[in-house]
Amino acid sequence: MAGRGKTLGSGVAKKSTSRSSKAGLQFPVGRIARFLKNGKYATRVGAGAPVYLAAVLEYLAAEVLELAGNAARDNKKTRIVPRHIQLAVRNDEELSKLLGDVTIANGGVMPNIHSLLLPKKAGASKPSADED
């Protein structure tokens, strides 16, 4: 009865591959799928939804980490701290809009001095000699 699709003597089990590796992602697709199911966001969750969400989250994390790494390098540091993440997010227009209401702990504030508080230029505010 070997002709009915059954293989004889082949007891080698196929190694399972994760959905993250199938999609080429680092973020856990299975865990995100579990969160979507247990979170009661919908009664049913499609097979592609957790893969897509994992890809979006991975992209956002990579984008923030790249910009924060650049901010750390600009400050001559080798370790990314929350201040670097704050500078990276607030200097990027799209990320700042996305995370506008988010407070980053130990992030500090953006350096900003109002133009009225800056000292006057010496050459620009000189009175002219013609006025007597």
Swiss-Prot record:
Tissue: Expressed mainly in non-dividing tissues of the plant. Also found in meristems and dividing cells.
Top-rank lineage group of the source organism: Eukaryota
Entry keywords, A to Z: Chromosome, DNA-binding, Nucleosome core, Nucleus
Statement: the UniProt record of this protein carries the keyword Nucleus: yes
GO cellular component terms attached to this protein's record: cytosol; nucleosome; nucleus
Pfam hit, one: Histone_H2A_C
Cellular compartments annotated: Nucleus; Chromosome
A GO MF term: protein heterodimerization activity
Post-translational modification as stated in the protein's UniProt record: Not ubiquitinated.
Keyword DNA-binding: yes
InterPro entries associated with the record: Histone-fold (IPR009072), Histone_H2A (IPR002119), Histone_H2A/H2B/H3 (IPR007125), Histone_H2A_C (IPR032454), Histone_H2A_CS (IPR032458)
Record-stated family: Belongs to the histone H2A family.
Self-association and partners: The nucleosome is a histone octamer containing two molecules each of H2A, H2B, H3 and H4 assembled in one H3-H4 heterotetramer and two H2A-H2B heterodimers. The octamer wraps approximately 147 bp of DNA.
Job of this protein: Core component of nucleosome. Nucleosomes wrap and compact DNA into chromatin, limiting DNA accessibility to the cellular machineries which require DNA as a template. Histones thereby play a central role in transcription regulation, DNA repair, DNA replication and chromosomal stability. DNA accessibility is regulated via a complex set of post-translational modifications of histones, also called histone code, and nucleosome remodeling.
The protein's name: Probable histone H2A.2
Native source organism of the sequence: Arabidopsis thaliana
